[in-house]
């Protein structure tokens, strides 16, 4: 059983402190309980309360995936179209810190595994402005695809904010030399983030003015942060960014239990759980759902999704508690490729 399910199913052990500025005003906070990451694998979850079904914390988690991607299978089908990997906020394709330091890859081990599929399919790792606006990032995404796909149709797999970039490119920019057959989003905040609200409203421990100054001194933009709020995504972005009937849309979400005390995602997880329910530390399950929702990855964090798992943590868990990893990011993305192949994409 996963740690997420074993410890109260993605719930805090003690009642959370109220966040009056963030709790939805449609119903009293005391009358609602966030939908937790619980239940039996592959079962659809019925909300605990139905007083206000529009409350995001009460949405269905869909299929819960606990160990389907624990190991890499012997065979995966290969999609017929190239795959584009679109990174999230503050992401990169490859980061070099010096001539004597090995480069850091955002898609650690994932892009290489996809390229090793039968037929050696083309895999394009896009590189967009790390903290630029959705519009800026989408334009660069389109340019990267046009330059590297060279007229071939593509399937986009996007992590986090990368999914918003891809949606904007498909709906607004519509590059003549880019033909997108499918978009698979992984933990993309399609309905914004309560944690972004928290930061923008000046309630967080991080002072945005200081953060913006640091980012600008590094030569990067800061427009992305304000575009991840729930107000902007729900009020501006989604109404003006309709899906294309020529593109297949798929999505995955993830949830994890309360992060360790010193984890940088502990506060963001708490805020998201109180306001939106089950989440991966940065994006809620409710916000991740778009198009054909394929399921919720249980006991998987936002960084686990791109193979940035803490190997030391899992080694300790295995030695002291006998726990083994139930999620392998490489197996997950190979399965997405297999799914696309079976869909004829």
Located regions from the model:
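A Trp-anchored, charged/polar loop motif used as the substrate-binding/catalytic surface
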Residues: 65-67, 222-241, 330, 334-344
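N-terminal mitochondrial targeting presequence
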Residues: 1-55
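Active-site catalytic motif of lipid deacylating hydrolases and related acyltransferases
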Residues: 76-154
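Alpha-helical membrane-targeting segments
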Residues: 6, 195-227, 259-276, 301-307, ...
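Short, solvent-exposed loop/turn segments at secondary-structure junctions
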Residues: 89-91, 129-131, 163, 189-191, ...
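C-terminal catalytic-base region of ester-bond hydrolases, centering on the histidine
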Residues: 244-345
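Serine-dependent carboxylesterase/thioesterase catalytic core
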Residues: 87, 135-241, 280
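Short amphipathic alpha-helices and their capping/turn segments at secondary-structure boundaries
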Residues: 61-78
